[in-house]
Amino acid sequence: MYNLCYIQNLLEYQIAAVEVGQHLYWEIGNFEVHAQVLITSWIVIGLILGLTFLATQNLQFIPTQNQNLIEYILEFIRDLTKSQIGESEYRPWIPFIGTMFLFIFVSNWSGALIPFKLVQLPNGELAAPTNDINTTVALALLTSVAYFYAGLRKKGLSYFGKYIKPTPILLPINILEDFTKPLSLSFRLFGNILADELVVAVLVSLVPLVVPIPMMFLGLFTSAIQALIFATLAAAYIGESIEDHH
């Protein structure tokens, strides 16, 4: 009985070392911002811009391996946007959907592939930007602004007529839907990335390093899927806002 209590206390101590919600704040005027989220976001943006710049230098008619990779990514984003928004309207939205997908994809993977834990901060620790609810909410709200803008740009004020279609009785439900879209986008992404990092952190604290490796690979796969889901839904919402209802 004593041994069981000792093991339980040991496990509780190790798991308790995995802290959630610790933040380093920067004061900008009267506001406080999460410093580690800004730092890791800048790292992710720098990686995307740097790799894109290097891969697009010295473009050739017969593409190199790096050029092939960039062209494949661009074609993938183009096809994704085209399938959700439509043949006639998709081109202006390729940069937006592509930026969303690449930022979320690299952010998700950075939590597993970049040794953020080696960087010591006065408070908190560095982690994937999408591990913070503020980042995912900002991305979701940006998506909401995008599909409202798309609908108003194409249809004008008649865009709001969708709220009373097919019957005015559905007005409250249709309005509520516009609030649930960003909520579902933000909490789905945040929950999956946070849960993945917590599971790996707990396993590393309990068992040797080799055991959590399969979970890390599974986390990389689910992180890529979450980036794809977010980009697909963002494109689908934009396509829904500009489609003609009869």
UniProtKB/Swiss-Prot annotation:
Keywords: ATP synthesis, CF(0), Chloroplast, Hydrogen ion transport, Ion transport, Membrane, Plastid, Thylakoid, Transmembrane, Transmembrane helix, Transport. It comes from Chara vulgaris (Common stonewort). The lineage of its organism: Eukaryota, Viridiplantae, Streptophyta, Charophyceae, Charales. The keyword Membrane applies. The chain crosses the membrane at residues 35-55, 94-114, 132-152, 198-218, 219-239. GO terms for molecular function: proton-transporting ATP synthase activity, rotational mechanism. This is ATP synthase subunit a, chloroplastic. The gene is atpI. It is a multi-pass membrane protein. F-type ATPases have 2 components, CF(1) - the catalytic core - and CF(0) - the membrane proton channel. CF(1) has five subunits: alpha(3), beta(3), gamma(1), delta(1), epsilon(1). CF(0) has four main subunits: a, b, b' and c.
